Regions:
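Short, small-residue-biased leader/transition segments that mark boundaries at the very start
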Residues: 2-9
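Structural motif
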Residues: 6, 36, 107-109, 178, ...
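N-terminal glycine/serine-rich phosphate-binding loop of ATP-dependent small-molecule kinases
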Residues: 10-121, 136, 168, 229, ...
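Active-site core segments that coordinate phosphate-bearing ligands/cofactors
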Residues: 17-24, 28-29, 95, 136-189, ...
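Short beta-strand-loop/turn "lid" adjacent to the catalytic site in phosphate-handling enzymes
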Residues: 88-125, 145-147, 180-192, 196-201, ...
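Carbohydrate-associated surface elements
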Residues: 128
């Protein structure tokens, strides 16, 4: 019978996975997100075979967003234990050894240590907006965009504040770098995560020498006993070995002592880099867009930009190619509020409608609208928007009396404006720097309704947008793939390895833009830029 043969295949697959685990052929990736720590175990075919998770929250202590050291280790152990339990339940075996191991985490922030390896001040995460002066001065000093969350901005702000601990610093790093160091003894960092600490020279695949020298000269009068290069982690690129799991490290990960030491470890990475790996967008001229509550686009560049743009953050792929990131705080929140208003309206008439059906029907309605949204204008600014220069926001909908005001255009304008700020950032790349974008991969809530967000996005960017059938397991899977790449790269570059070994059979749907769609979106964007004064007036006058 068919069912019998399916069960037979499943049993055979399970037996293969079981022997993979018992022989120590599986690879583990763990990523520390801002609300969840996630572990993904992959088999020799790069497929996730088990996951573990641990939920955690940052705390606001003395005005600083932080996680305690105890929480970091409790979270790591809890997440690993959860994975081990799933492996036991699914396959009836216990993990004793691994083929490879990798850690990733939210980027940036500040973890500083003294000569006794003691944490000098509580971990300052990327969420802290406390380094405004440092960021401003470093942009001038380096002629390079240094956002507030970059580690060097945190260090320089501590210097500007004359904080006592700065004199005692022996080493500072990111969260992924910290966990990796404690498990391997190695003070290293993957280049993607390192690019969120200090600017990178993409030719040498290391920190920018001139900027290191400029920084030391700039703070010379402080007479600190360190130079900046001495206290930064060593930069490694994808595929390089970054050390081995030590006996103490194995105990930190698995306090039961079941996991053996000696596993090779890949360079620890940041969540931007692992996201690029998990979406197969590390190739030049490609990028990915994550669109949900907020939206960000990451585009892999072929060369340095001609000048500094504060709207764009510069990071790198795990292989060390330059990436421009346009991040916008606001995306789908306002549209969700409107859809919930329509839901309330239907409920008032006693109509029961499923939320997914409501979203899908209204999103699809947008495709019937005019390419330029019929002259309508909206801003989805629930909060401030740095790309367009707003420190706070007011969601806003406005039209002329002769605009084509109908449901299709109404939904379409709210979908289009959700990408307006991000498009402003991308226009700098495509129009002022002549960057070519050939392919975009979309993921996140905006793409949940098939074909709609994708169509609007393709017209906004002017490039085909692909959405994969499975969203994958995100960054934890990405760092597991990087650990596997270290062991099995042969002579392949990272993008070749991903395309030929990992994603060769992945199912995806691509939508290309149309000439009419691109022109319509440009017309909408002219209206969007011209109307920013209306948004400003709403902020000034609606208190």
């Amino acid at each position: 019978s068919l069912v019998g043969s399916e069960m037979c295949i499943r049993d055979r697959t399970n037996e293969m996975i079981k022997s993979n685990i018992e022989q120590g052929l599986t690879t583990l990736g763990i990523e520390f997100g801002s609300t969840r720590i996630k572990a993904v175990l992959i088999n020799t075919d790069h497929e996730p075979i088990a996951v573990g998770a641990y939920d955690w929250e940052n705390s606001l202590i003395d005005g600083i967003w932080t996680y305690s050291e105890e929480e970091i280790w409790a979270g790591l152990q809890g997440c690993y234990k959860n994975l081990v339990e799933e492996v036991k339940a699914k396959y009836g075996v216990t993990i004793t050894k691994l083929a490879g191991l990798g850690f990733s985490a939210m980027m940036h922030g500040y973890l500083a240590f003294d000569e006794k390896d003691t944490l000098l001040v509580p971990f300052r995460t990327w969420r802290n907006n406390i380094t405004g002066q440092a960021s401003h001065e470093l942009i001038k000093l380096f002629n390079y965009n240094v956002p507030q969350r970059f580690s060097i901005a945190h260090l320089y702000q501590a210097i500007l504040n004359n904080e006592e601990h700065v004199n005692k610093i022996k080493f500072f790093t990111t969260l992924a770098g910290f966990v990796h160091w404690k498990l391997s003894g190695e003070k290293v960092l993957g280049i993607g995560d390192a690019s969120g600490m200090f600017p990178i020279d993409i030719n040498t695949k290391d920190y920018n020498e001139k900027m290191l020298a400029d920084f030391d000269a700039h703070i010379a009068d402080k007479n600190y006993p360190w130079s900046i290069r001495e206290i930064l982690p060593k930069v490694l690129v994808a595929g390089e070995n970054a050390g081995y799991l030590t006996a103490e490290g194995a105990k930190l990960l698995d306090p039961t002592g079941t996991l053996q030491a000696g596993t090779p470890m890949c360079p620890p990475e940041g969540d931007a880099g692992t996201g690029m790996v998990a979406t197969n967008t590390v190739t030049k001229r490609t990028g990915n867009v994550s669109a949900g509550t907020s939206v960000f686009a990451m585009i892999v560049l072929e060369r340095d930009l001609s000048k500094v743009y504060e709207e764009l953050d510069m990071v790198t792929t795990p292989a060390g190619d330059l990436v421009a990131m346009a991040h916008s705080n606001n995306c789908t929140t306002d549209l969700n509020s409107w859809i919930s208003l329509f839901h309330e309206c239907l409920t008032s008439f006693g109509v029961k409608v499923d939320a997914n059906e409501l979203f899908s029907t209204l999103y699809n309605k947008a495709l019937e609208g005019d390419a330029d949204c019929g002259g309508l204008l909206a801003y989805c600014y629930h909060s401030g928007e740095h790309i367009t220069g707003f420190t706070e926001g007011r969601p806003l909908f406005v039209r002329k009396s002769d605009s084509k005001f109908n449901l299709a255009n109404f939904i379409r304008v709210h979908l289009s404006t959700a990408l307006g700020a991000m498009k402003t950032g991308l226009d700098i790349l495509t129009k002022e720097e002549n960057v070519t974008i050939e392919q975009i991969l979309g993921h996140g809530g905006l793409f949940k309704t098939k074909g709609v967000g994708q169509t609007i996005m393709a017209n906004a960017i002017g490039a085909p947008v692909t959405v994969m059938e499975t969203a994958g397991e995100g960054g934890a899977w990405g760092i597991a793939l990087l650990a596997d790449y270290m062991n099995n790269k042969e002579n392949l570059s990272l993008d070749e390895y991903l395309s030929t070994k990992v994603f060769k059979n992945s199912v995806a749907e691509t939508i290309a833009p149309t000439k009419e769609g691109i022109e319509g979106f440009e017309t909408f964007m002219t209206r969007y830029r011209n109307g920013l004064a209306i948004e400003q007036s709403a902020i000034d006058n609606l208190k």
